[in-house]
């Protein structure tokens, strides 16, 4: 394999693995903050137990996510130095803000939250976990600011062969950012909600701590349903924007080789033939693509062949069509998983309202399996986003082939891929082990564990302990 292919494999694999933990942390910490707030408002100890139990799982996930994220930024300098040299002035600014501001905020307030139980006033303690939640969201904002520049470069000028920032305001008001950011955050909230719902379903099947996990499930499904609808709405907005910013990605995601005609039908299924540049065995939904692209039931969508000819006039000779099969199917996996999650959330709330939830074993088993669906949807969405932008690293400015480090060797890349793979497998196994251990212990263990023990040698409890 070439250095370019190996560098892409390494970046894709490490990024996808890291992004298993990022949305989970954002979603879980939001749920924990919500639970602690409900405890303050309703004075119900059940919500306090919920905040502590799910908070333990959040901390485990957060720690592993931090470790996997450290390796990401090193790759820009080691494997993608030409990219870093060209856009570092623009791309580096939001990443620096993320590290110095957002992650710093998370680190401070997560410590106060961990060690502040029974030490800080209850409202201040709850504020700490909300600030952690805000910090995780702001981390995403700044990272997505950098990514949005790759999708739709703004706020820069080319000087001495480099992109230099000349408008920071344009960077943070990038239209791509404001359709991408809510889509990612709603997806993260759905991830945390469905994880809580799936674990709660497992416990309800076992008939363990039923009131606790039934309430956890109900809250998770309310958030999960709202998040799922938010994902759908923001995704629709993103599709509309793609028509302006990256029409080739839109065409590839539809397997659309020729212009669609007016109105445009959405292709639910197709056999993609990249060699002959055609699609067959298509199952189409009339008018749907026009609505997806223009929010009306009319309008045509340009095909990849038309766009290829247009791009050649702008950028010169080259192949500007991304990997079509990957882009096409990753989009459908993302959408399909999202639809299933929305239906599952509606079903769970209906069963809970009818007081049939804990006895619906078939549904609870489905919810355990659906823990994986948000991760599947998140990964598929990012695969579509990044693969669909190819051959560009920065849309219209720099190709992926131009971005790789000139001095990196295939041997060093292969070694680091194997080393990172082994380390990530160990981290993943450790996370699963710790999750299973905490889940088996249950919420009652956390409750007993948190009972304060007096350190006064003259207290009654300690005195009797010494006497015996």
Swiss-Prot record:
Membrane topology type: Multi-pass membrane protein
Give Gene Ontology CC terms.
cytochrome complex; plasma membrane
- Residue segments, region Disordered: 448-468
Q: Which GO terms describe its molecular function?
A: electron transfer activity; heme binding; metal ion binding; oxidoreductase activity, acting on diphenols and related substances as donors, oxygen as acceptor
* Assembly and oligomerization: Heterodimer of subunits I and II.
Q: Name one GO biological process term.
A: aerobic electron transport chain
Q: Report the source organism.
A: Bacillus subtilis (strain 168)
Name the keywords, alphabetized: Cell membrane, Electron transport, Heme, Iron, Membrane, Metal-binding, Oxidoreductase, Translocase, Transmembrane, Transmembrane helix, Transport
Q: Which cofactor does it need?
A: heme b; heme d cis-diol
Q: Which family does it belong to?
A: Belongs to the cytochrome ubiquinol oxidase subunit 1 family.
User: Which of this chain's residues are annotated to bind heme b b558?
Assistant: 183, 334
Which chemical reaction does it catalyze?
2 a ubiquinol + O2(in) + 4 H(+)(in) = 2 a ubiquinone + 2 H2O(in) + 4 H(+)(out)
Q: Where are the transmembrane segments?
A: 15-35, 51-71, 95-115, 124-144, 177-197, 219-239, 331-351, 366-386, 416-436
Q: Give the UniProt subcellular location, in the record's own words.
A: Cell membrane
* Sites where the protein binds heme b b595: 18
Q: What is its EC number?
A: 7.1.1.7
* Name of this protein: Cytochrome bd ubiquinol oxidase subunit 1
InterPro entries in alphabetical order? Cyt-d_ubiquinol_oxidase_su_1
Report the Pfam families cross-referenced here: Cyt_bd_oxida_I
How is the cofactor bound, as the UniProt entry phrases it?
Binds 1 protoheme IX center (heme b558) per subunit.
Per the record, the domain of life is: Bacteria
């Amino acid at each position: 394999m070439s250095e370019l292919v190996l560098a892409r494999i390494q970046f894709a694999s490490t990024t996808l693995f890291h992004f298993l933990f990022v949305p989970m942390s954002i979603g879980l910490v939001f749920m924990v903050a919500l639970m602690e707030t409900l405890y303050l408002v309703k004075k119900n100890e059940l919500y306090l137990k919920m905040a502590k139990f799910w908070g333990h799982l959040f901390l485990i996930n957060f720690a592993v996510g931090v470790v996997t994220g450290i390796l990401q930024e090193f790759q820009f300098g080691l494997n993608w130095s030409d990219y870093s040299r060209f856009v570092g002035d623009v791309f580096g600014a939001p990443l620096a803000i993320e590290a110095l501001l957002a992650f710093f905020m998370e680190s401070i307030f997560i410590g106060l939250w961990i060690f502040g139980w029974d030490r800080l006033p209850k409202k201040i303690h709850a504020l700490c976990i909300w600030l952690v939640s805000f910090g995780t969201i702001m981390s995403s904002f700044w990272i997505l600011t950098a990514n949005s520049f790759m999708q739709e470069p703004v706020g820069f000028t080319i000087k001495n062969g480099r992109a230099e920032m000349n408008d920071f305001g344009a960077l943070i008001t990038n239209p791509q950012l404001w359709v991408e950011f809510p889509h990612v955050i709603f997806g993260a909230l759905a991830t945390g909600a469905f994880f809580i719902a799936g674990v709660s379903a497992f416990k309800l099947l076992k008939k363990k701590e039923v009131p606790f996990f039934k309430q956890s499930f109900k809250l998770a499904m309310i958030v999960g349903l709202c998040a799922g609808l938010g994902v759908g709405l923001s995704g629709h907005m993103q599709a509309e924007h793609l028509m302006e910013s990256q029409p080739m990605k839109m065409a590839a995601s539809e397997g659309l080789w020729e212009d669609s005609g007016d109105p445009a039908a959405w292709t639910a299924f197709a056999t993609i033939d990249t060699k002959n540049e055609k699609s067959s065995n298509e199952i189409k939904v009339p008018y749907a693509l026009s609505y997806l692209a223009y929010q009306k039931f009319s309008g045509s969508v340009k095909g990849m062949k038309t766009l290829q000819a247009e791009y050649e006039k702008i950028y010169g000779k080259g192949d500007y069509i991304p990997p079509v099969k990957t882009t096409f199917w990753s989009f459908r996996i993302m959408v399909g998983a999202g639809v299933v999650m929305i239906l599952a959330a509606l079903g769970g709330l209906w069963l809970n309202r009818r007081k049939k939830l804990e006895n619906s074993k078939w549904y609870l088993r489905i919810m355990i399996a659906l823990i994986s669906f948000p991760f599947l949807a998140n990964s598929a969405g990012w695969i579509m986003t990044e693969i669909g932008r190819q051959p560009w690293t920065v849309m219209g400015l720099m190709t992926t082939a131009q971005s790789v480090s000139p001095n990196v060797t295939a041997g060093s890349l292969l070694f680091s891929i194997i080393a990172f793979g082994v380390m990530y497998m160990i981290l993943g196994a450790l996370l699963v082990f710790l999750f299973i251990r905490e889940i088996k212990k249950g919420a009652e263990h956390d409750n007993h564990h948190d009972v304060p023990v007096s350190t006064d040698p003259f207290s009654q409890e300690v005195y009797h302990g010494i006497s015996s």
